[in-house]
């Protein structure tokens, strides 16, 4: 899986309602209320809102071939990309106003139609006909459709925050919920933080290697700066190449410490801020383990579980680099 996938997919604040769900009507009213009461917040901070719910063991039918398949049905109001982990193989995702289209995973498409290129085929879900608009690759058999009922209720919300709210996405999401009174019993998961943390963990090793090479280049320059130009030029050239690599890598991958924005306090005099953030993250991780399982949270938990092993390996490799550099310094040619 592409490392940038984690950063791109976990790019919202997830709300998991613990009660009977949040109605579609109340969501529409909350959005309109937000536009009227605080238009600047809505236009400058809240980028999008997606509501969704899942149904295990939903049955799909090919009415012409009589084939049936059991899937995880996802009913939503908003952007399909913000629901469960998947990659589009053919066709398109269904936009919010299209209540007659659907999206299938490739295995279910083959099971129902005998081919994974099933776009424009018809199927039945709860005796209602739907046209396949897109086929995706997913870890589970899945069927996605936009909600057509005004009385629909959802247990999951995904709030996307604009760049103006970077580092404070969780705070803005909580403020939106408090102002709209959609629910007062929920779990909140800061996907921005976890997505950037997972993304950075894959790149951190390369960043550390480049940093060590840069330190090595500067040290060689200091050693040879009082010697002949013939000895000095290779050190300058090496340092220039390493700096160019760092700048190029930064341009292609972005800030490797973007997840750390969460730990920057709004007021520098707030010395308890860091403790509050750490406690909040601990609570979120504990809540994650007890939430009703869905592919989104399962991927996050699995990724966070492998993260600690990846960080342990990173520490060992970094320690090895340190020992190598230490022994190198002891060599006679390193003495200025």
Predicted regions mapped to residue ranges:
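Solvent-exposed, non-transmembrane alpha-helical starts
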Residues: 20-26, 67, 98-100, 139-145, ...
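Membrane-proximal extracellular/periplasmic loop immediately following the first transmembrane helix
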Residues: 1-59, 264-288
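Juxtamembrane interface at the cytosolic side of transmembrane helices
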Residues: 208-254, 321-336
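Mid-to-C-terminal secondary-structure elements
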Residues: 78-89, 104-163, 173-180, 189-190
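The feature marks short, hydrophobic/small-residue-biased sequence motifs that occur predominantly
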Residues: 45-96
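Hydrophobic alpha-helical transmembrane segments of polytopic membrane proteins
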Residues: 313-321
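A residue-level structural signature of the nucleotidyltransferase/glycosyltransferase Rossmann-like core
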Residues: 73, 100-101, 122
């Amino acid at each position: 899986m592409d490392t940038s996938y984690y950063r791109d997919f976990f790019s919202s604040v997830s709300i998991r309602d613990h009660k009977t769900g949040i109605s579609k009507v109340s969501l529409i009213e909350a959005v309109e209320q937000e536009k009227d009461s605080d238009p600047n917040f809505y236009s400058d901070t809240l980028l999008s809102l997606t509501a969704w719910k899942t149904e295990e063991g939903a049955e799909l039918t090919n009415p012409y071939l009589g084939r049936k398949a059991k899937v995880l049905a996802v009913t939503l109001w908003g952007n399909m990309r913000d629901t469960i982990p998947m990659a589009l193989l053919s066709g398109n995702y269904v936009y919010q106003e299209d209540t007659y289209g659907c999206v299938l995973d490739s295995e279910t498409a083959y099971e129902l139609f005998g081919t994974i290129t099933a776009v424009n085929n018809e199927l039945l879900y709860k005796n209602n006909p739907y046209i396949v608009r897109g086929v995706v690759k997913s870890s589970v058999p899945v069927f996605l459709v936009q909600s057509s009922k005004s009385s629909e209720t959802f247990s999951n919300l995904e709030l996307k925050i604009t760049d103006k709210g970077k580092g404070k996405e969780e705070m803005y999401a909580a403020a939106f919920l408090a102002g709209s009174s959609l629910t007062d019993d929920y779990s909140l998961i800061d996907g921005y933080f976890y997505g950037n943390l997972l993304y950075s963990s894959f790149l951190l090793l390369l960043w550390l290697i480049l940093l060590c090479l840069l330190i090595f280049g500067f040290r060689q320059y200091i050693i040879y700066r009082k010697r002949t130009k013939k000895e000095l030029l290779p050190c300058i050239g090496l340092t220039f190449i390493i700096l160019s690599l760092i700048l190029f890598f930064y341009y292609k991958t972005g800030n490797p410490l973007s997840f750390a924005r969460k730990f920057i306090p709004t007021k520098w005099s707030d010395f308890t801020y860091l403790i509050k953030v750490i406690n909040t993250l601990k609570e979120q991780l504990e809540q994650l383990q007890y939430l009703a399982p869905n592919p989104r949270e399962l991927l996050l938990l699995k990724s966070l579980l492998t993260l600690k092993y990846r960080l342990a390996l990173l520490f060992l490799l970094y320690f090895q680099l340190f020992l190598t550099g230490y022994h190198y310094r002891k060599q006679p040619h390193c003495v200025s």
